[in-house]
Amino acid sequence: MMEPPAAAARASCRRRPLLCLLLAALCMPPALGLYTVNAVYGDTITMPCRLEVPDGLMFGKWKYEMPNGSPVFIAFRSSTKKNVQYDDVPDYKDRLSLSENYTLSIKNARISDEKRFVCMLVTEDDVSEEPTVVKVFKQPSQPEILHQADFLETEKLKMLGECVVRDSYPEGNVTWYKNGRVLQPVEEVVVINLRKVENRSTGLFTMTSSLQYMPTKEDANAKFTCIVTYHGPSGQKTIQSEPVVFDVHYPTEKVTIRVLSQSSTIKEGDNVTLKCSGNGNPPPQEFLFYIPGETEGIRSSDTYVMTDVRRNATGEYKCSLIDKSMMDATTITVHYLDLQLTPSGEVTKQIGEALPVSCTISSSRNATVFWIKDNTRMKTSPSFSSLQYQDAGNYICETTLQEVEGLKKRKTLKLIVEGKPQIKMTKKTNTNKMSKTIVCHVEGFPKPAVQWTVTGSGSLINKTEETKYVNGKFSSKIIIAPEENVTLTCIAENELERTVTSLNVSAISIPEYDEPEDRNDDNSEKVNDQAKLIVGIVVGLLLVALVAGVVYWLYVKKSKTASKHVDKDLGNIEENKKLEENNHKSET
């Protein structure tokens, strides 16, 4: 007669109590509020057995549960023999380590290690279990923005790029930012799509978020980034990509023309460059340039060059886009300065002649005119009604435009004043009463050559000492000690004429009238002018009083004046008579 199943089971348990305890442990339902161990992908998972080691412990075991609830034993340790055995489970081969206190370690944590592990401590009478749940985390790679657009265009929705985040567990979330602010989806302006792909061999996720964006002009320097938000052992974290900046294309809204010149003002002879630019991006590369008086534009790049400009280049210049939709204009003034000097170059005139000189200018602004003679600035413009030797020299008429840098003109006049030699002789007895000094005052240009001749006897102490030739004048002198009356002749000769003048000189023993060696020509001219004025007044009064008396008086006056001049030129009448008598005696 067979035993009932229940009775048979009880009998079996009495014979094999340990087996019954293990079977009972396997049939226990999962407990709530399980202990969790957080592990990092690739690191070692450490799971302590959270049971108190009982008396009479025979061994300890670790197992994990399959998704369907069935157990898989992986490690065994005997409390008596102190030996450890690892079950033949391929996923955990060479990865397990069970310590004396029944702490289980798993090397090189994987995503597949996310399971419910159970620590079992077995005695003869009981089996104790404590489950541990393992959670594995993998930090993702830094986000990268790939497949970036070459440029963005306003008013156009365009793929900006893809933010790729690799090897994350659990899967993370990707967010786009512009200048540090979250980009929220806006229809036809901001379009974001996220895809997640799991690697079946590793269990890791790769997230790809694409961004389509319609920019504005203000986005020209905007920084775009993407951030992945993921979970780690210590909580939620984020990683940001490197920022990227995109070139934003937008149409030209304004055209500007500028004048490129080395100075603020333009003068004749300068090179001028006109530059046209548009505020679009990219800027226009070609424009139409309009010069004054022309209706058709000249097609060119963004610059138009004019070389060696003239005054007729003054006017309004324009530039426009090729389609002529936008235009700008600017005015150019080419400054000029003309100078006309009459006469100019080398001019030769005779002394006493008149020479009209004019320096006229024509300019775009008021100009300053000044004269320079022989490197010295003149106070007034030269005027020659009666040329004198001192008027000769190098004249420069110079004019400048103060407001225009580098604009000045100058012309030169080299004035040569020629004259035939003019001679005036003077004599003076020296203080030692032993000699006389005879001076020949000479005027003329070119400079006359002077020669002396002596008629009579007498010793020539010092001959031909010449003063400096200044303003067409110089003097030559000799010192003589005549033993008798002599005649000295001064000969002055230049390219125009030869002039000869003689002077009678008494013997040193005969006193005579001495003339001053030199007189100031200006003073003599003033004296002559005053004399003429006085004579004129006197003559007028006498004419009113008595015409006949005045005529007689004038006749007498002129006779006396003539005799005085004769005396002055020849020495005096007495001296001449004495000289004639002495000469006559000598001849006898």
UniProtKB/Swiss-Prot annotation:
UniProtKB keywords: Adaptive immunity, Cell adhesion, Cell membrane, Cell projection, Disulfide bond, Glycoprotein, Immunity, Immunoglobulin domain, Membrane, Repeat, Signal, Transmembrane, Transmembrane helix
Extracellular-side positions: 34-532
Domain Ig-like V-type: 34-126, 131-240
Subcellular localization(s) per the UniProt record: Cell membrane; Cell projection, Axon; Cell projection, Dendrite
GO biological process: adaptive immune response; axon extension involved in axon guidance; cell adhesion; cell aggregation; heterophilic cell-cell adhesion via plasma membrane cell adhesion molecules; homophilic cell adhesion via plasma membrane adhesion molecules; neuron projection extension; retinal ganglion cell axon guidance
GO CC term, one of those recorded: plasma membrane
Domain Ig-like C2-type span(s) in chain numbering: 251-333, 338-414, 421-501
Main location: membrane
Signal sequence coordinates: 1-33
Entry-listed glycosylation sites: N101, N173, N199, N271, N312, N366, N462, N485, N504
Membrane association type: Single-pass type I membrane protein
Post-translational modification: Glycosylated.
Expression by tissue: Detected in embryo. Detected in embryonic spinal cord and embryonic brain. Within the spinal cord it is localized to axons in the dorsal funiculus, midline floor plate cells, and motoneurons. Detected in embryonic epithelia and brain. After hatching, detected in bursa of Fabricius and thymus. Detected on embryonic retinal ganglion cell axon growth cones (at protein level). Detected in embryonic retina and in the optic fiber layer, which is composed of retinal ganglion cell axons and their growth cones.
GO MF terms, alphabetically ordered: identical protein binding
Regions of this protein lying in the Cytoplasmic compartment: 554-588
Residue pairs linked by disulfide bridges in the UniProt entry: C49-C119, C163-C226, C276-C319, C359-C397, C440-C490
Transmembrane portions of the chain: 533-553
Function, in words: Cell adhesion molecule that mediates both heterotypic cell-cell contacts via its interaction with CD6, as well as homotypic cell-cell contacts. Promotes T-cell activation and proliferation via its interactions with CD6. Contributes to the formation and maturation of the immunological synapse via its interactions with CD6. Mediates homotypic interactions with cells that express ALCAM. Mediates attachment of dendritic cells onto endothelial cells via homotypic interaction. Inhibits endothelial cell migration and promotes endothelial tube formation via homotypic interactions.
Free-text domain note: The CD6 binding site is located in the N-terminal Ig-like domain.
Subunit structure, interactors included: Homodimer. Interacts (via extracellular domain) with CD6 (via extracellular domain). Homodimerization and interaction with CD6 involve the same region and cannot occur simultaneously. The affinity for CD6 is much higher than the affinity for self-association.
The name this protein goes by in its record: CD166 antigen
Organism: Gallus gallus
